[in-house]
Amino acid sequence: MKYKLLPCLLAIFLTGCDRTEVTLSFTPEMASFSNEFDFDPLRGPVKDFTQTLMDEQGEVTKRVSGTLSEEGCFDSLELLDLENNTVVALVLDANYYRDAQTLEKRVRLQGKCQLAELPSAGVSWETDDNGFVIKASSKQMQMEYRYDDQGYPLGKTTKSHDKTLSVSATPSTDPIKKLDYTAVTILNNQRVGNVKQSCEYDSHANPVDCQLIIVDEGVKPAIERVYTIKNTIDYY
C-alpha cells in the first residue's frame, strides 16, 4: 500500500497533489466593499457567502450576505443590522446597484464594478491606481482608507467638523491568518476602544468561525463584549 502513495508524495513536491491553491491577496472590490459595508473581506474564487455576527447569548445582531461573479464583482449584497435597525439589499444592474425591492438606483459604479458614488447621501469615492477605494467624501465628512501589500484593509480615518476618528488594524504576521487581528480606535487623539479577533480557517485561508472581542474604553469602567462570527462560503 505504501508504494501507491509515492506518486502522490512526489506530486506534492512538484505540483501540490490536488491541494487547493491559496490566494493570499484581496481584490480591490472585496476589500473596498468590506470597508463600506463592515464585514470581513474574503479571498479566492468566492461564489457566495454569509457572515453572521452573534452576541454572547447567541442572538444574531448582524448578517451580511453576498453573491459574486467569477470576475469578483458583487452581483448582490444584503446587510441586516439589528442593533441599528438597518436593512440594505442591493442588486447589480450595469453601472449601478439598485435597491432589491424598489429597483431605485442606489450606488453608481466605476471601472469594472467598483464604488463611485452614493447620490442620495452626496458621497463619492476615489480609487488608487490598483482600483482600491482610498477616499470617500461628502459635504459633512472625509474618509481615508489604508491597505497592506496584499490588499488587506488596515483601517480608516474619518474627519467630520471638529472630530477625527481613526481605526488602525494590525493583522497576524501569518499571511494565512489575516483575519486574526487587533485594532485600536482613537477619537481626537484619545483612545476610546480596542478590538481583538481570532479565527479558524478553511482551505482558501478564509475565516469560518471567529471570536470577536470589542472593548469600549470611552466609558469607565471599560465594557467588554464578546461576539461570535459564523461564515458560510461557497466557491467556484
UniProtKB/Swiss-Prot annotation:
Residues 1-16 form the signal peptide. It is a lipid-anchor. Keywords: Cell membrane, Lipoprotein, Membrane, Palmitate, Signal. It is found in: Cell membrane. GO terms for cellular component: plasma membrane. A lipid is attached at C17 (N-palmitoyl cysteine). This is UPF0257 lipoprotein YnfC.
